[in-house]
Amino acid sequence: NVDKLMTFDMMGDLKKLCRKTISMQEGPHWYFQDYTMEQQIWWYNSLTEFDMLFAHNWKDVNYYRGITNKLVQKMPTLMLAERLGIIPRNEWSDAVMIGGNMVRWYGGFDSYVVAQHFDMPISAPSMGRKIDREDEMDIQHLPYMTWVEWIKTLSQYYVGVHMMPTHAAGTFTLNCAFHGIPCIGYKGLDTQEDLHPLLSVDDGDMRGAIKLAKKLKDYKFYEECSLMCRENYEKSMYTEERCRSYLE
């Protein structure tokens, strides 16, 4: 709760306890601009007092460097699937997983429109922003589940669609790549561009996304995208081994 944080000297107390103070981005870089004016100024001042900032995507790195003139580093989103005994898929059904619910934050409606072009059953995870009457659509809404349950369930899907305009950690596209599931999504999200380069479109380019959905019906193109995203995942900084090397 921001109001509660503002009741005490957060940065002063942190600097008394720590030699270095670091802030880790959570959510899109513009999120604080939905706060009250007083809260926005308080958070901006706090950002300028941290010794270093960690950010999700390179565009976030540039944003924070610009407004704070501080040291900002990219903190890759990390998957520890192998540690939990989770293995990539080896069989799946003809079904589409979209990446969120019917709210602007997730872009669920746009994902649904694109997903319809596969002529397959469509599923969606249940997120905290799920709205009333979503269950009336021809979408199978998964129950709330743990991450382990989610990643195992995702393995049974043919393709992912994630037209999410809110760029943050990028876990959905990352999870898809782990399983070798091609995922259509927006540029600007590093996990999307790094792992699914052939399936990344500009923000709002629904026409391009629909063209890709139709193109993925071609088995050779599908296999190319499937193998590419899995290989990209294995050599990316989103794995534990390579992330450790990157941070060192």
Locate each region found by the language model.
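Conserved catalytic-core segment of nucleotide-activated headgroup transferases in glycan assembly
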Residues: 80-147
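Short acidic alpha-helix that forms the nucleotide-activated donor recognition element
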Residues: 146-157, 178
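Donor nucleotide-sugar binding/catalytic pocket of nucleotide-sugar-dependent glycosyltransferases
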Residues: 51-65, 69-85
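Acidic donor-binding loop of glycosyltransferase active sites
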Residues: 155-168, 181
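Short alpha-helical segment that forms part of, or immediately flanks, the ligand-binding pocket
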Residues: 151, 173-179, 192
